[in-house]
């Protein structure tokens, strides 16, 4: 098995390409080891010293490390953990479906939200996935779009610029009802996240 690696715009995050499917659909974000209990792959990666986050995509894995840990020391152990996982035949996530990022939408906002999601899915998410991350929609309220940045995008030094200059400008250009785009910080309780977005 040959695993390629790619750097990301976030110097604390590295993208691993195992050459096979990681998740059949969706993405999975594990910002800490406690959240990784449903993923044998993420658990193995959190077992490597200095790992602070794991993100799984369709055909890639991104790993975020502490600043004090050097990639030259962590990378061989991470490659070994990924190889061991795929050779074991285990699933990346135990019997769990990809998370559903849909939110309740008022009837008057349904068309706008549909346009927002279409632009995110066709223009934004593919570009962000190339950098080892993802952006998910979490709400639209009075002109404000709420998004969550995951994987290499979470904590990336250029994430604010991506959000404001890239995504916000794109959405405002095509959808005049959009006035602002805000990023939600990671909150482990999804019901609390939904309350913040609306």
Language model features with spans:
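Flexible helix-coil linker/hinge segments at domain or subdomain boundaries
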Residues: 86-93, 170-183
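Strongly charged, low-complexity linkers/loops
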Residues: 107-157
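Short acidic amphipathic segments
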Residues: 42-60, 134, 172-181
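Conserved small/polar residues in nucleotide/adenosyl-binding loops
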Residues: 185-191
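A short interface-forming secondary-structure element
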Residues: 23-25, 33-34, 63-69, 145-164
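Short amphipathic alpha-helix segments
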Residues: 32-48, 118-125
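N-terminal presequence-like segments and adjacent domain-start helices
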Residues: 6-32, 76-77, 84-118
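Charge-rich, low-aromatic oligomerization/scaffolding segments with amphipathic character
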Residues: 69-86, 157-160
